[in-house]
Design a protein with these regions (language model features):
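Conserved AMP-binding/adenylate-forming core of the ANL superfamily
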Residues: 12-13, 29-75, 79-83, 100-105, ...
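Conserved pre-ATP/AMP-binding loop-to-beta segment of ANL
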Residues: 28-29, 151-169, 176, 199-205
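Conserved AMP-binding A3 loop
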Residues: 42-44, 165-189
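Conserved structural elements of the adenylate-forming
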Residues: 47-55, 180-201, 213, 261-262
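AMP-binding/adenylate-forming catalytic core of the ANL superfamily
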Residues: 99, 116-118, 363, 368-369, ...
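Conserved AMP-binding/adenylation subdomain of ANL enzymes
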Residues: 188-205, 213-253, 267-268, 337
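Conserved AMP-binding/adenylate-forming
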Residues: 229, 281, 288-307, 311-399, ...
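AMP-binding/adenylate-forming catalytic domain of the ANL superfamily
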Residues: 477-498, 517-520
């Protein structure tokens, strides 16, 4: 590479650490972190801890592009590690502690970390000592002594734009998790997107309750420090703690996932509390009954985010839509975001208006491929676009409608059936809080759709099912009719960390829960 190209590359390849440090220099007394116990840290104090940890890592032999794994609940130290790695150009492998021991071991073995950070809560997880050539640092009093006695790192930031900062693990329907590589460039672009699209500024606080091994927290936790706002750590979804934060701080984005909204509404109903202000809340509106969105936007006097994104893309490509507060009827069509280009692909051609195609994306918020997965990367990034595996339709007004996952089709008698279409019909009934449609073997058709729902009143089960079958007959083509509608407790529905239903586990439940393997 020519010298001029090296110099221009350095000048334009800014790192997350440099932007965070810039905020600390400009606003040293500004609030950066509110920890689990309520302790507060200014940008100046938090930067000092980050620089001291950077020194600790270097003394442990960590170099540019080395991986460090972390297995911990949400806490200050999690973001501290991400920022220290951003400073020295190392990579954080954020391990999903909800995975099985076997899967956790797989993820750690895949990235081959030189060092692993463990909280007390996960010391015994996955028998990590069986993995060779791995050192540990535990979050205990010894860790605090390491930070206290270290000299702050005074060197230049070693990370740059296209360097990988965090590996987030995504779970598919089959096989082991894949490690999505998120660069400094992607995190910076995602922060700028949040500031632009949702008007997040330095006065806001992000309540990081979703696991930090997921983009729902890590993206905006890092983004908040880039923007100059603050992060409040919460160990999981705790309605009482979130209610207190709502009363004390102006919130940037209150993450709310499918499956938890009904309980949160019940908790808030009848309680008196002041709201400092929330810029936006929620996610994945099309997976939630409309009446719940109306209820929560009324309770919190806040609009709801009609999002469509992924670990690989960040909140773009289509999270530009906001559902106004307190409205009862609204569109769930997605609005394309400003920070990426989206095309819908069908048979290697751009799909015609109104026809479904796979969502393919380009833009600065994109990840840099999956760790050690060349064949998958070549396939998913074909023709210079990242193919998401989601089927969508573009409307005449430019909006996008989610159809379903490309990989989950029900093939019935030669016809393709997308579960989401049937689920939307079922969710339109006022008594249905959850609806999942999966495939079941059929002697006649090969596969048929079958529905599993959650309802508020089990005593009315038979009446509700009868009404739903009538609704399906009037709204869906004959071959799309669910062969049966089964009822289950909402708490028994298997979900991913984002709250999305895991259909392959629901299919297993047909056998274990309902003793069904096929339908005539």
């Amino acid at each position: 590479m020519k010298k001029e190209n090296i110099l221009t590359s350095k000048a334009t390849g800014m790192s997350v650490a440099e932007l965070f440090q810039s905020q600390a220099i400009k606003n040293p007394r500004a609030l950066a972190i509110i920890n689990l116990n309520g302790d507060k840290y200014t940008y100046k104090v938090f930067l000092l801890r980050v620089l001291k940890l950077a020194t600790v890592l270097i003394k442990k032999g960590i170099k540019h592009k080395d991986r460090i794994a972390i297995l911990s609940e949400n806490r200050l130290e999690y973001l501290e590690l991400e920022m220290a790695c951003a400073k020295i150009g190392a990579v954080v492998a954020a391990i999903n502690w909800r995975l099985s021991d076997k899967e956790v071991n797989y993820c750690i073995s895949l990235v081959k970390p030189k060092l692993t950070f463990l909280s007390e809560k996960f010391k015994t997880k996955a028998k990590l000592s069986t993995i060779k050539k791995i050192s540990f640092i535990f979050y205990d009093s010894k860790y605090e002594n390491l930070i206290k006695n270290a000299i702050p790192y005074a060197g230049a930031s070693l990370g740059s734009g296209e360097d990988i900062l965090v590996i987030l693990f995504t779970s598919g329907t089959t096989g082991y998790p894949k490690g999505a590589k998120i660069s400094h460039r992607a995190f910076i672009a995602r922060a700028m997107y949040s500031a632009y699209e949702y008007k997040i500024n330095k006065e806001d606080t992000f309540p990081a309750w979703a696991p930090m091994f997921h983009m729902a927290s890590t993206d905006l936790a890092i983004g908040s420090l880039i923007i100059g706002s603050s992060v409040a750590f919460v160990d999981g979804f705790q309605p009482k703690v979130l209610k207190n934060l709502i009363q004390k701080y102006k919130l940037s984005w209150l993450v709310l996932m499918p499956g938890m909204l009904e309980g949160f509404i019940k908790f808030l109903n009848g309680k008196k509390f002041n709201i400092k202000g929330i810029k936006t809340m929620g996610a994945m509106a099309d997976l939630i009954p409309m009446k719940q969105i109306t209820e929560i936007t009324t309770l919190l006097d806040t609009p709801y985010l009609n999002s469509f994104g992924s670990t690989e893309t960040g909140m773009p490509p289509a999270s530009g839509g906001i559902i106004s507060k307190k409205v009862k009827n609204f569109s769930l069509s997605k609005i394309q975001s400003s920070f990426c280009e989206v095309i819908l692909v069908n048979n290697n051609k751009v799909a015609e208006l109104g026809t479904s195609g796979e969502c393919a994306v380009r833009g600065p918020t994109l990840f840099s491929g999956y760790w050690k997965a060349e064949s998958t990367n070549l396939k998913d990034f074909r023709n210079g676009w990242f193919h998401m595996g989601d089927m969508m339709k573009r409307n005449i007004n430019g909006t996008l409608d989610f159809v379903d996952r490309k990989k989950y089709l029900i093939k019935s008698g030669g016809e393709n059936i997308y579960p989401a279409e049937i689920e939307r019909i079922l969710l339109s009934h006022k008594n249905v809080s959850e609806a999942i449609v999966v495939k079941i073997k059929s002697k006649k058709w090969g596969e048929s759709p079958i529905a599993i729902i959650s309802i508020g009143n089990f005593l009315e089960k038979d009446v509700i099912i009868k009404k739903l079958k009538k609704l399906c007959r009037s709204s869906l083509a004959g071959y799309k009719q669910p062969v049966d509608i089964l009822v289950i407790n909402e708490t028994d529905i298997p979900r991913s960390t984002t709250g999305k239903v895991q259909r392959h586990f629901v299919e297993d439940m047909l056998k274990t829960y309902f003793n069904l393997e096929s339908f005539n």
